[in-house]
Amino acid sequence: LLFLTLLTASHEISIDGRLDDASWKQAVEYTKYYESLPFTLDEPKDFQKVLILEDEKGIYLGFVNEQAKDTVRANKHERDDEMANTDKAGLAIDFDGDGLAAYSFTVSASGSISDGIYRNENEVNYDWDADWKSAVFIDENFWYIEMFIPWTIAPMKSVEGEFREVKLSFWRLLASEWRVNTTIKGNPRQEKFMSLFHPYRFKNYKVTSIDYFPYVTVSDDRLLEEIDEKFGAEIFWKIDSGKQLNIALNPDFGQVESDELVVNFSSSETFYSDKRPFFSENHSLFDVKGFTYFYIINTRRIGAAPDYNCNQFAKPQQNLCEASKVGINDIDYAIRYTQKSESFDFGFLGASEADESFSKGRDFYSFRLRKNYENISLGYLGTYTDRPILDRDADVHALDMVYRPNDKTRIDSIYISSKVDQGLGNLNKDGEAFRFRLTASPTTNRYYDAFLFFFDEDTDINDMGYQIIDDYFFGGLQSGFKKSDFSDSSIFLSNQLELGFGHERSEEHTS
């Protein structure tokens, strides 16, 4: 294990990509990389190193990548474009060092950036867009990245003592050869990724910050001769390293990027992730899910199309009700509080929608607890939704566990209980669901994966969450073998052989 205690003087560094500020002479260097794609773990053919500095403001990183200028692919791309054909380098940081969440930061040779959050060992979510700085410079034989990541960028556990231990992984992609070099013996395409991060020791700074984003909008409809005025604010308060409070008052999400176009001919609802900053920021503690099958909390439900019951009105009013339907609901307020300590985390999320014509706003509440031990994490996530137009109350309770009996095996499971009471239509149902997964990597070239999903016919978490289907069972086992020790003259970089079987049953079919 590598523990680096870094110098803690305040640094005056200009983030311009040139790495020519005097402070870089004090930096710790890291040069040990492995070729992890293909997964040979050999010494890389190309040289690269990382420079690391810190002060009370955050972490400074310098990437030095040896490469002839005429071979560098520096294509501009959209933020978070994972498949962009360009040379890249970056890192992932587990600020708590517990293997539950890691934040990734990537910079392309063009200067384009990507950031996201890793959970469940190697599952990444790119909806998180953070506020950090980077710059790139390319000369004849090297290209460089300067990066600054503030301590306020993500929630961190409150720890005692002079130092904080985080875990890091650095990487570099050479696009022309599609080779990846990493400082750990793994990558996100392997079954083990986050658990392989190297520990680093930084000074334990006490940080606090508060950001306000007020707004005022005025719209004038000259046809209807109506003037609409709206004002509100979003507040992000990082109380200290472990506590964070976010408040949105009558928020305006008009600047959020649109969803991707999805053509769906199935009977299942399409899941859309939330790109609204308030709901994507500081959400990792509440992110309890089962791959793409379910999400206990789907924040896209908050502010979605209102509920209506136009049939309760007489014909003229019924027609007016139908004509008044809107596709989104304004939000009166939303609040999120999270607190993380060395062994215990908890959080609260609540939101209330505004009343619309012929509709009443819904209320959403969620409470999260998580207890962390040396090799096991136990959690509870509960949600409650009130939908007054439907006279509907929905409760969901979920228990989750992540267990690592050794460094080669990982077990995670989630148990879900749901209950719906709806006066309109006299609908009452209780359901249960379960997810189990075991992954094992006895050697670097062999892995096993056992999995189980179950939803009974009355499971319904869709009021505040998302589930792809009900009355469903899926179980299976998969084994894989990877070969990457091919000679330089071979046409192959790596081969992978997988053998698996499974059984799937739903109300529609069995396979």
Over which residues does each language-model region extend?
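Transmembrane beta-strands of outer-membrane beta-barrel pores
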Residues: Q67, W151, L174, V216-R222, ...
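Repeated loop/turn-to-beta-strand initiation elements of outer-membrane beta-barrel proteins
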Residues: I59, K243-L245, S343-F348, Y373-Y380, ...
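Structural signature of outer-membrane beta-barrel channels/translocons
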Residues: D94-D96, P150, F236-K238, T338-E342, ...
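Structural preference for beta-rich elements and adjacent junctions enriched in aromatics
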Residues: L6-Y365, R370
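Membrane-embedded beta-strand positions of outer-membrane beta-barrel proteins
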Residues: G17, Y212-P214, I247, Y337, ...
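Hydrophobic, lipid-facing positions within transmembrane beta-strands of outer-membrane proteins
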Residues: A89, I210-Y212, E229-I235, D274, ...
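Exposed, low-structure sequence patches enriched in small/polar residues
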Residues: D330, A394, N406, R410-S511
